[in-house]
């Protein structure tokens, strides 16, 4: 975190400025007793001439000298005792009042009276005495004070002002504000604040915290904003692949597309083929298996069920085992017929036929033949869904370890898909997966 000079430290220099203005310099610094060169004296004279002159009243000057001495000697009780007389001066100037307020800040902090210190800070801010560079830090001090008192509203109020007045606010500080806003039910504001933290870190080429995405997910749930929630979850699973996050993404795709078979097959595929991903529920794995079987990809059903069983999500007994055995039998049958289907497809002018055969090879785990056949079909033309075909091609290429070619296929899928469409979004999930590297669990 960026080091910042504390505002309370700067009060010392303010207090010294008061002393100089009252011609009390001899009591301030032993360094001033040292002989100075003509050049140093000239520089000081120029600086003094350029500096704004403090406007202290005659009454203030008369009473302030002993108070300044007590300040210099850190006799804070004496300073506090002297302040009421100074505050009673008739018609005090603005500089009189600011000096008194400054001494009150120093003295209340010096004696350790936290309540009086906080009150002095609030008064100092309210009167506009704080230098602009100190306003944020003073609000942060107040936020810490009210946090200790468990006054959530005041904590949020002052931490918000700290952020607003701090040009170099850090991502962790934005997280704190986001948490306070979320606690206060300010979900829209919390989403925005946490998004700023994420964008700030990404702008530096660094990886945002997983927790920031998780907190945003809570915000969007409260706001019932599924569109924004999906975008946040997609970014989360791209950075931190996990079966729970994939399952949330898949569930939203399912709801938004009314369980569209093409979309769901691709969504399940990217989740389960990711070694760091998977699905978190039995229902999701069974839906993947069913979708794959209907689509003519029994090998994906096998991989789905075996992954779910291996991860302890899908029970190994009962109908699940029966479905697995049936899918394995279908794969064995396909392996016998696919060579003939591939030869026939090669002679067909329609590329769509090649793509369907390519799905069969992908199903059986022959990823090289899958990639070859799909590429041939795309080159022929006449493919009904180029986005779907290129996603399948990219998946096969990624299994072969050809990451660069896979990325090109995913980019082609994204370009072919309508803007913002589910398959275009799934292409982005694949691209994130390809950027991380790694291979899928062993194919069945």
PLM region spans:
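Residue at a conserved register position within TPR or TPR-like alpha-solenoid repeats
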Residues: 70, 104, 108, 139, ...
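Generic helix N-cap/helix-start motif at coil->alpha-helix transitions
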Residues: 56-64, 94-101, 131-141, 166-176, ...
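TPR-repeat structural position
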Residues: 76, 114, 152, 187-188, ...
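Structural motif corresponding to the intra-repeat A-B loop/turn of tetratricopeptide repeats
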Residues: 73, 111, 149, 184, ...
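N-terminal leader/linker segments that initiate helical-solenoid repeat arrays
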Residues: 16, 20-119, 131-137, 425-426, ...
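C-terminal soluble interaction/assembly domains
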Residues: 350-444
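Solenoid-like repeat scaffolds
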Residues: 48-55, 87-94, 123-132, 160-168, ...
């Amino acid at each position: 975190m960026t080091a910042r000079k504390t505002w309370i430290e700067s009060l010392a220099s303010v207090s010294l400025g008061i002393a100089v203005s009252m011609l009390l310099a001899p009591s301030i610094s032993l360094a001033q007793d040292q002989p100075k060169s003509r050049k140093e004296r000239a520089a000081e004279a120029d600086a003094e001439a350029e500096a704004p002159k403090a406007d202290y009243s005659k009454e203030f000057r008369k009473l302030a000298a002993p108070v300044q001495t007590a300040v210099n000697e850190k006799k804070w009780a004496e300073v506090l005792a002297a302040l009421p007389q100074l505050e009673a001066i008739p018609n005090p100037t603005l500089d009189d009042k600011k000096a008194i307020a400054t001494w009150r800040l120093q003295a209340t902090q010096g004696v350790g009276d936290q309540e009086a210190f906080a009150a002095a800070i609030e008064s100092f801010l309210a009167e506009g005495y704080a230098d602009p560079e100190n306003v944020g830090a003073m609000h942060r001090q107040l936020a810490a004070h009210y946090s200790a008192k468990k006054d959530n509203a005041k904590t949020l109020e002052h931490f918000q002002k700290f952020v607003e007045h701090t040009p170099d606010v850090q991502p962790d500080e934005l997280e704190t504000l986001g948490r306070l806003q979320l606690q206060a039910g300010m979900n829209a504001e919390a989403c925005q604040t946490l998004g700023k933290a994420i964008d700030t870190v990404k702008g530096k080429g660094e990886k945002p915290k997983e927790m920031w995405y998780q907190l945003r997910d809570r915000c969007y749930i409260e706001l019932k904003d599924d569109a924004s929630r999906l975008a946040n979850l997609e970014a989360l699973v791209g950075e931190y692949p996990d079966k729970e996050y994939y399952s949330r993404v898949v569930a939203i795709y399912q709801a938004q597309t009314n369980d569209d078979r093409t979309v769901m097959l691709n969504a399940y595929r990217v989740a389960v083929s990711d070694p760091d991903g998977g699905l978190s529920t039995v229902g999701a794995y069974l839906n993947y298996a069913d979708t794959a079987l209907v689509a003519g990809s029994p090998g994906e059903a096998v991989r789905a069920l075996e992954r779910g069983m291996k991860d302890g999500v899908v029970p190994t007994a009962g109908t699940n085992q029966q479905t697995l055995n049936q899918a394995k039998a279908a794969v064995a049958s396909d392996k016998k017929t696919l060579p003939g289907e591939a030869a026939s497809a090669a002679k067909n002018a329609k590329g769509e036929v090649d793509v369907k055969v390519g799905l069969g090879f992908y199903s059986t785990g022959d990823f090289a033949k899958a990639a070859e056949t799909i590429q041939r079909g795309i080159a022929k033309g006449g493919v009904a869904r180029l986005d779907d075909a290129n996603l399948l091609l990219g998946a096969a290429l990624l299994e072969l370890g050809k990451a660069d070619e896979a990325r090109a296929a995913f980019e082609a899928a994204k370009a072919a898909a309508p803007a913002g469409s589910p398959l275009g979004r799934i292409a982005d999930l694949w691209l994130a997966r390809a950027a991380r590297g790694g291979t899928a669990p062993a194919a069945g």
